[in-house]
């Protein structure tokens, strides 16, 4: 059987087995990251870029009055600076004396109307939402749009790997 045929079979099985897959992968609340970097809408863009760089994350939910109002990524913050230096990195951009970020706020550059998830959603539903909207992370919010965490692609991979490890054992080969 070809690798492509196996891949198609896997996708077909996944679609037909969605209720089982939902049960196995669990909920967004079980998979999400709870210790999340949050950026204030009125924070300077320069400070936001420094914070993302320092925390080693590529993006974060944006909050205003305790509610998620957007999402911002390093890319969103770097685009204005690329006009100065197309090869710029966050560290070099922040070291530059004439950064185009000066005077800009997170709210000027963020993606508004963020796609969000809820803790009770199945991970499968959240992944579908990520794919449909072309995003890599979903802020997880309560009914009042207050942040509870974030679900990232890495969180999804961990959920799948956890399921795979549980199903196939620890991954060690006992046949020496």
Regions found by a protein language model. Give the residues of each.
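Tandem CBS (Cystathionine beta-synthase) repeat/Bateman regulatory domains
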Residues: 1-176
């Amino acid at each position: 059987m070809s690798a492509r045929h196996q891949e198609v079979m896997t996708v077909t099985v996944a679609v037909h087995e969605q209720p089982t897959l939902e049960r196995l992968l669990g909920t967004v609340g079980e998979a999400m990251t709870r210790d999340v970097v949050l950026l204030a809408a009125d924070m300077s863009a320069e400070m936001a870029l420094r914070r993302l760089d320092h925390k080693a994350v590529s993006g974060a939910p944006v909050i205003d009055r305790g509610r998620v109002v957007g999402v911002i990524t390093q890319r969103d913050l770097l685009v204005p600076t690329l006009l100065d230096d197309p090869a710029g990195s966050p560290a070099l951009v922040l070291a530059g004396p004439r950064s185009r970020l000066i005077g800009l706020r997170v709210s000027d550059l963020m993606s508004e109307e963020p796609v969000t998830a809820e803790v009770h959603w199945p991970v499968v539903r959240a992944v579908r939402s990520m794919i449909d909207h072309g995003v890599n992370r979903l802020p997880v919010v309560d009914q009042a749009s207050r942040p509870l965490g974030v679900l990232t692609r890495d969180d999804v991979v961990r959920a799948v790997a956890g399921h795979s490890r549980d199903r196939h054992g620890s991954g060690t080969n006992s046949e020496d």
